[in-house]
A protein has these predicted regions:
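Bacterial Sec-dependent N-terminal signal peptides
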Residues: 1-28
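Metalloprotease/metallohydrolase-associated module, dominated by Zn2+-dependent proteases
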Residues: 29, 33-84, 93, 136-190
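Active-site scaffold of zinc-dependent metalloenzymes
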Residues: 81-105
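Active-site His/Glu-centered metal-binding helix of metallohydrolases
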Residues: 110-119
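Short alpha-helical functional segments enriched in proximate histidine and acidic residues
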Residues: 117, 130, 158
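Membrane-interfacial alpha-helical segments at the cytosolic side of multi-pass membrane proteins
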Residues: 122-131
Length: 190
């Protein structure tokens, strides 16, 4: 019986209102050494401006930045030639990497930032579903990582589409349409 343990791997997405996403990939060692505050995604808890604790540069032109991450941990066991996988997938908000400029922000921008977090949660759910449906071989670590990378690519494309179609929250009609669409998806796929 072989056992493979992978602790955590996270990719942060920093989404700026009125800006483009930036990525910061952390190695497992960096992730393990971090003791950073996070807020797990929950349908019962919405972001508040007080959650945005990071500092912005005076030269920064964006109104706000939301840093979210999808992380995973898994254990793989092979018994009688079959792979058994226990996996945990989390979607989290990183307060110290997220910031806002009070003079530029309002409830519409906060709603826009919340939706970035909600979109990340939808992709965490897609990741869980693909893992549950996948038939793993002896290359579990690489297969999980490949699925993870594909989900992150899809997330990046989706986040960019969201910002483009809402014009970074400036198109209120589109923002409201997106709010409704994502809320429906979250309700259907818990």
């Amino acid at each position: 019986m072989g056992t493979l343990r992978i602790l955590f791997f996270t990719l942060f997405f920093c989404i700026s209102a009125f800006g483009l996403p930036q990525e910061e990939e952390l190695s497992q060692e960096e992730e393990l050494s971090q003791k950073e505050e996070t807020i797990p995604w929950s349908a019962d808890r919405k972001l508040q401006w007080s959650d945005f604790k990071g500092s912005y540069f005076k030269t920064e032109w964006a109104a706000a930045t939301t840093a979210t991450g999808i992380s995973y941990a898994f254990t793989a066991n092979k018994q009688n030639g079959q792979q058994f996988l226990e996996i945990q997938v989390n979607c989290e908000f990183f307060p110290q990497k997220s910031w806002y400029r009070p003079e530029l922000c309002d409830s519409v921008i906060l709603s826009h930032e919340q939706l970035h977090f909600d979109i990340a949660e939808l992709h965490a759910r897609k990741f869980r579903k693909r893992l549950a449906e996948f038939r793993f071989t002896d290359n579990v670590k690489e297969e999980v990582r490949d699925i993870y990378k594909q989900i992150l690519k899809e997330l990046r494309i989706f986040q960019n589409k969201y910002d483009r179609e809402t014009d970074f929250s400036k198109d209120l009609q589109q923002q409201l349409l997106w709010n409704g669409s994502i809320a429906r998806e979250l309700a259907v796929d818990p």
